[in-house]
From Swiss-Prot:
Subunit structure: The nucleosome is a histone octamer containing two molecules each of H2A, H2B, H3 and H4 assembled in one H3-H4 heterotetramer and two H2A-H2B heterodimers. The octamer wraps approximately 147 bp of DNA.
Signal peptide bounds: none
Keywords annotated in UniProt: Chromosome, DNA-binding, Glycoprotein, Isopeptide bond, Nucleosome core, Nucleus, Ubl conjugation
Name of this chain's protein: Histone H2B.2, embryonic
Ranges of Basic residues composition bias in the record: 10-30
Native species: Psammechinus miliaris
Cross-link (Glycyl lysine isopeptide (Lys-Gly) (interchain with G-Cter in ubiquitin)): 118
Amino acid sequence: MAPTAQVAKKGSKKAVKAPRPSGGKKRNRKRKESYGIYIYKVLKQVHPDTGISSRAMIIMNSFVNDIFERIAGESSRLAQYNKKSTISSREIQTAVRLILPGELAKHAVSEGTKAVTKYTTSK
């Protein structure tokens, strides 16, 4: 007589899993990529005592994705106009100047330049 279900022995470390009823295949969940942890880190740098709701995080993530796509698209177009196959920091900088308005573009360019300088000196 063969047992139909596995029984865990006393003191065993592994948990016994119930058999899968449908097809027997394990489903792999697709991971959702997000800027959430980075948004949270920046929030804590600027306002350490402030939190963020999950809905606000979704909106911020959508905003970052939108800006990223706009800058990537514009810098791609600029590279094509100049017959270049590589997007450099110069194309990114020009795209930021074209997309973001006035003072916001100046701040973004200065922060971007600072980040590139920090990256190149750390190598």
